[in-house]
Amino acid sequence: SSDVCSSDLVPSTPANGKQLLKAAIKDPNPVIYFENKGLFPVKGDVPEDLPPIDLSRAQVVREGADVTLVSYGLMLTKALTAADVARREYGVSVEVIDLRSITPLDMPTIYASVKKTGHLVIAHEAIKIGGVGGEIAARVAENHFDYLRGPVLRVGARFTPLPFSPVMEDFVLSGEKEILDAVLAAAGKSAVDGADGAAGRAGEAA
C-alpha cells in the first residue's frame, strides 16, 4: 500500500524506551528500533501508566530562548549536560529537543523552536557527513532560512572508523565539551569566558 511507511526510533531514556517500544509493537507499519548499547546501564523511573507516544513527534525536553539544540539517543544526556553548563556558567538559555524518531523527522517542532531562538545546533553520535544533522540543517535552510540569525552548527563523530578500544572510542566520539562549544559559538560566546573553560565544567557536570 502507498500508505505504508517505516519508522526509525531511537530511545534516549528508560521511560521513553518503554513508550517507543510499545508504540512500535502497536504500529501496523515496519518499525526499526535502535537502542544504543551505551544506554544499557542507564537507570531511571519507568512509571506503569506512561501515556501513549506519537511516533512522528519529537519532544521538547527543555525550553529555552537563545539556542535550539537537537539530539537523540545516547547523545541526548550529553546535550542536556551541555545545556545545563551553558545556562549556569554563561547565561545561555538552550531549548533541547529529543527527536525520538529519525524517520520520520518532526520538522514542525524544530521549525517552531528555531523561529523562537534563531540559532540551531544538532548533536548526534554518528559522523557529520551524510548524517541526520545534515538533513535537518538542509531542511531548515531550504524552508526557513529567514528564521536563522547564524549558521547551523553540527556536532558528530570524527570521520574515521570507530575503534574497539574504549579510550580511542572516546577520542573519536563527540561529548559534552564539543556540544557546549557549539552552543556557545551559536550564541556568540566563547568557551574561554569562564575560569576553567568549557571542557572542565562540562566534565564536572556529567
Locate the predicted segments by residue.
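Short, small-residue-biased leader/transition segments that mark boundaries at the very start
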Residues: 1-6
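Short, well-ordered beta-strand core segments
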Residues: 7-8, 120
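Ferredoxin-type iron-sulfur electron-transfer modules in oxidoreductases and energy-metabolism complexes
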Residues: 13
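Beta-rich nucleic-acid/ligand-interaction surfaces
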Residues: 18-22, 105-106
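A generic secondary-structure signal marking the coil-to-beta-strand transition
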Residues: 29-30, 151
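Thiamine diphosphate
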Residues: 37-206
